[in-house]
Amino acid sequence: MLLKVRKSKASGNVRIPGSKSHTIRALFFASLAEGKSEIQSPLISDDALSAVEVCRALGAKIEKEDDKYVVEGFGGNPEVPEDVINVGNSGTTLRFGIMTAALGDGCSVFTGDRQIRQRPLGPLLCAINNLGAEAFSTRNNGRAPVVVKGKLKGGRTEIDSVTSQYLSSILINSPLIPLDTEVIVTRLNEVPYVDMTLWWLDKLGIKYENHDYKTFYIKGGQRYRPLNVTIPGDFSSATFFAVQAAISGEEFVLDNLDMTDPQGDKMVFSILEDMGAKVKVEGKSVRIKGCELVGREIDMNAIPDALPAMAVAGCFAKGETKLLNVPQARIKETDRIHVMCEQLKKMGADITELEDGLVIRESRLKGCKLEGYGDHRVVMSLAIAGLNAEGETVIDTAEAVNVTFPDFVNFLSRCGADISTCE
């Protein structure tokens, strides 16, 4: 599917859909619990649906009722799946799911789409082995497909958490292991996502110790109680509208955003404000209006998902914008550092690729044919670039937006953007 975009203004009110990260965590916690849970206002997208199917395959009973999921959990004792588990494009689901499967007896096999089969799992597989279960890559390359055989027992492991999902997977599942677990963290990127996982553990009354994110102790033999939660809006999805407002001079009011939530991407609003945009928090809404932007040096380690959109913002900021300390952006759905540099250069951007980020200088962009590489955040970021570039921009693999934000095109169109899809 192609996404066609022409230079146009967009403004208005947008209700941001539920957080993908919270939705997937809620589904796993509810599945691991014993009893019935309700998840209100979840994100309905390809990634979230992948999590639903994985939890079902492991024994959870999940029904969609109006705007909520009702989950009957398996009490920390997952079933042996009837077939190979396919996580689609969801890296979070894969990394959480393989350790959940290791809580039970028997073998499970996990795979995913082409992008998933290229994303690393090695450190998490080693941790699973260190904690008493078995896990290995069928191609012996630390990537899916992987085979997992339970049961986890507990003990001590190190983890090189180049992606926070490795550590989060251990934190989510280890309370249900019979013995205590000690985790030595040799590297940790994306700390806010770990904070989100810890927020859930606190909410559910789990006993653990966090020693400055270097060492974690998790008491074994615990249980998750059923939960009744409402999923907050997704700051990662809000980022695209925030950047559109900031670079165009228009105004958006973005509803369903809770600034007290642990999501790291809420930092985007303070970054854009520091660059010159006008930002006002109004309860559970954020009002953002564009103004002349000035380039900044930004440490992106905590917010790697914002790199594609902030690369676009840098094209419209005076001077130079540096997006630094985010090497993990290279192991997302695509190598987002390389892909954004490559595609924005096609539009005329003055942009330089670094090992751990990008340097962008103010540029006049021109529409052209672009490759989205099937990466939802790349496609949506290039769409924002296209709305502010001369002429027409055509982006391929537009269907990728369904991974996290199926209504992205409709929302922008309703706000006045000249944007549409076609085969």
UniProtKB/Swiss-Prot annotation:
InterPro entries the record matches: Enolpyruvate_Tfrase_dom, Enolpyruvate_Tfrase_sf, EPSP_synthase, EPSP_synthase_CS, RNA3'P_cycl/enolpyr_Trfase_a/b
Localization in the cell: Cytoplasm
CDD domains with a match to the protein in the record: EPSP_synthase
Enzyme class: transferase
Main localization of the protein described in the UniProt heading: cytoplasm
Molecular function per GO: 3-phosphoshikimate 1-carboxyvinyltransferase activity
UniProt-listed Pfam families: EPSP_synthase (PF00275)
Keywords attached to this entry: Amino-acid biosynthesis, Aromatic amino acid biosynthesis, Cytoplasm, Transferase
Active site: 305
Binding positions (phosphoenolpyruvate): 20, 91, 119, 165, 336, 377
EC number: 2.5.1.19
Biological-process GO terms, alphabetical: amino acid biosynthetic process; aromatic amino acid family biosynthetic process; chorismate biosynthetic process
Binding-site residues, 3-phosphoshikimate: 20-21, 25, 163-165, 305, 328, 332
Catalytic activity: 3-phosphoshikimate + phosphoenolpyruvate = 5-O-(1-carboxyvinyl)-3-phosphoshikimate + phosphate
Pathway where this protein functions: Metabolic intermediate biosynthesis; chorismate biosynthesis; chorismate from D-erythrose 4-phosphate and phosphoenolpyruvate: step 6/7
One cellular component term from this protein's GO annotations in UniProt: cytoplasm
Entry's family note: Belongs to the EPSP synthase family.
PANTHER family: AROM/DEHYDROQUINATE SYNTHASE, PENTAFUNCTIONAL AROM POLYPEPTIDE
Physiological role: Catalyzes the transfer of the enolpyruvyl moiety of phosphoenolpyruvate (PEP) to the 5-hydroxyl of shikimate-3-phosphate (S3P) to produce enolpyruvyl shikimate-3-phosphate and inorganic phosphate.
Subunit structure: Monomer.
UniProt name for this protein: 3-phosphoshikimate 1-carboxyvinyltransferase
Designated gene of the protein: aroA
